[in-house]
């Protein structure tokens, strides 16, 4: 939290060092003042967007990542699902204290106008466009579409939220899903096929990315049947899991705790 600190036990790097000098960091380099095995790298982008050189992660004791061990070989490779910055921005205490979630609108999504073909952006956009043309209740937000500064605007009032990942791979889900749970929405989700390893099966509704007509049928039926109200207990449990387990700070703490149990920490 303080780049000028020189008395620390651990170093945590979120993707990369700052490119501009800050604190003791110069030329994207930090003189290490703790044991090398007490360093953690959190990767941010999936392998379809960013490939890390072997040299960079090899400097860290642990890598929290959704990259496969094949894409990012490292002796401290640790599956880090949900280790991303939230874009749903409220004071943490307010999020923890909130018990009631009044919903006055039906369906929203956040999808930018990006249509890159080397990632899933094009398919994501095409699916969203197809659904928006056929679902008048769908409010579409996103860069180049309808700008917002905070996801709360696009989630707090809505029962349902369309979530489509930009990269489809087992174990890779992002804040697109977790932010929806924090806002107590029921996600229509196109993404990680193993998301039920983390969250209750009833807490989200899978939709096919490559079959827009089928996705439309699933969404319409769910809203007509009142699935939001039926699934509230599962959504609440998914929200609890995000707040207590599947977030950057909880998983970083778990790495440090496991190290304390098995390794050595500087006094």
Describe every region a protein language model picked out.
Residues 1-42, 52-144, 148-267:
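Pol beta-like nucleotidyltransferase catalytic core
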Residues 45:
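Catalytic toxin/effector domains delivered as secreted proteins or via bacterial secretion systems
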